[in-house]
Regions:
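Hydrophobic alpha-helical segments, chiefly the membrane-spanning helices
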Residues: 424-430
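Short conserved segment of the HATPase_c
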Residues: 78-98
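Conserved short strand/loop->alpha-helix "switch" segment adjacent to the catalytic nucleotide/phosphoryl-transfer site
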Residues: 22-37
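Conserved small/polar residues in nucleotide/adenosyl-binding loops
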Residues: 413-420
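Alpha-helix capping/hinge segments and adjacent helical runs
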Residues: 16-17
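Short acidic, Gly/Ser-rich segments with clustered Asp/Glu that frequently serve as metal-coordination loops
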Residues: 74
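GHKL-family ATPase ATP-binding module
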Residues: 1-10, 33, 38, 46-49, ...
Length: 430
């Protein structure tokens, strides 16, 4: 029962990892532990993006632990000058602690909030970290986010043998199910390998014999689109694959179109290799660039029927595409990073997409007209549906009393006659 009094004594201050334990849904997806794996994986991928990692391994262990290992530089083990604890302990136990705020250590990265792995620690029964760095091997462990053992050296390794291994066991009380969604995880791992050419990712499900996979791509997006669209009819024999770079931003995309619903719909967007399921600035910029280039192409070649206007959805509805953006200091909508809110990046993507597609369309006019035809058909269908809805509203008018009801027959809208206005619902006994 709530107290009537409200004074300073009622104010609570959550410290350490308590905010995560109190409101886990604000920091991760609590439907299953997949997002915890992604948080650890993203740290390893950030090492790969910076050129310090070429191998990542993920294992689902028989005892319920999940292990993510990389051959990056290894988490810092020296003492932090201000907080007086090792770098690895600070990263695992303190929210908003990390080396990715300034951009000095990572040009492009996804772990920008300094929250990810500390959330994993907070929501795990047990977590163990092994670091190989400076010819030494170190270990530290945690229980429910609290340090269980101090960082200690446990061995020596070769100078070039570096990396970080994090093994954790998700606490089931924080999740709807503690089962990892393996299909979704594999899709994510494959996409990471595609978006970071030269990176090898190994997956091993120890709970199921023979469930092992390795992903390695040299030509990235092109291979990914070809594999993902297997079994679907495509308009273009060769997909459009492009890349643009500036000092602080990069854009890569691959796109093709299908004249009928594809077997597997591909409409994926990524920022610094993090999947943005809700799109955001980069997707909006991409759609804008596609629309502007195709509209200009159609207008120049007089392809549009009089009075018909195409929109971005008309252009992209029949498309299979993957968009990968990289930028410094991206602004995400929340910790789960499902939507990008970096407004400046939208104009970068839009202008570059338009330039690339405009050149392509005007050098591949026959294929360009096929793409335009799909957009025009979509726009015409949309216009017909809109007209039906508007006519329906016009005919509907005020609600009719008693047994009289509005006629909902398509005939009313296609070929109305004076007799087709009202239908009388008669009782079955009449």
């Amino acid at each position: 029962m709530a107290k009537n009094s409200y004074d300073a004594e009622a104010i609570e201050v959550l410290s350490g990892l308590d905010p995560v334990k109190k409101r886990p849904g604000m920091y991760t997806d609590t439907s299953n532990p997949n997002h915890l794996i992604q948080e650890v994986l993203d740290n390893s991928v950030d090492e790969a993006l910076s050129g310090h990692c070429s191998n990542i391994k993920i294992a689902l262990m028989k005892d319920g632990f999940i292990k993510v290992s990389d051959d990056g530089r290894g988490m810092p083990v020296d003492e932090h000058p201000e907080h007086k604890v090792s770098g690895v302990e600070l990263i695992l136990c303190k929210l908003h602690a990390g080396a990715k705020f300034s951009g000095d250590d990572y040009n492009f990265s996804g772990g920008l909030h300094g929250v990810g792995v500390s959330v994993v620690n907070a929501l795990s029964d047990e977590l163990e970290v092994t670091v190989k760095r400076d010819s030494k091997e170190y270990e530290i462990s945690f229980n429910n986010g609290d340090k269980a053992s101090d960082l200690k050296q446990v061995g020596e390794v070769g100078l070039r043998n570096t990396g970080t291994s994090i093994k954790f066991k998700p606490n089931p009380k924080y999740f709807e199910t503690n089962e990892v969604q393996i299909k979704n995880l594999k899709h994510l791992l494959r996409a990471k390998a595609v978006l970071c050419p030269g990176l090898t990712i190994d997956f091993n499900n120890e709970k199921k014999s023979g469930d092992k996979e390795r992903w390695f791509f040299e030509d990235g997006l092109k291979s990914y689109l070809v594999e993902s669209s297997e079994g679907s009819e495509l308009v273009l024999e060769d997909s459009i694959v492009c890349s643009k770079k500036s000092d602080a931003q990069e854009l890569e995309f691959a796109i093709n179109w299908s004249p009928r619903p594809p077997k597997n719909k591909l409409d994926e967007t990524y920022v610094n290799l993090i999947p943005t399921l809700q799109g955001g600035s980069h997707l909006n910029g991409f759609k804008s660039g596609l629309l502007d280039s195709l509209k200009e192409f159609c207008e120049y070649r007089n392809l549009l029927p009089k009075g018909l206007k195409i929109n971005a959805d008309d252009v992209i509805n029949s498309a299979l595409f993957i968009v990968s953006s990289k930028l410094q200091n991206p602004q995400f909508a929340g910790q789960t990073k499902e939507r990008l809110d970096s407004k400046d990046h939208m104009s970068f993507v839009a202008s570059n997409t338009k330039d690339i597609l405009s050149i392509w369309l005007n050098t591949h006019t026959e294929e360009g007209e096929k793409i335009a035809e799909l957009a025009i058909i979509s726009a015409q269908t949309r216009a017909k549906v809109s007209n039906i809805v508007e006519r329906k509203k016009t005919f509907k008018g005020p609600a009719l009393p008693g047994k009289l009801s509005d006629c909902n027959s398509c005939l009313l809208y296609t070929s109305p006659s004076p007799r087709d206005g009202l239908l009388s619902r008669m009782p079955s006994s009449a």
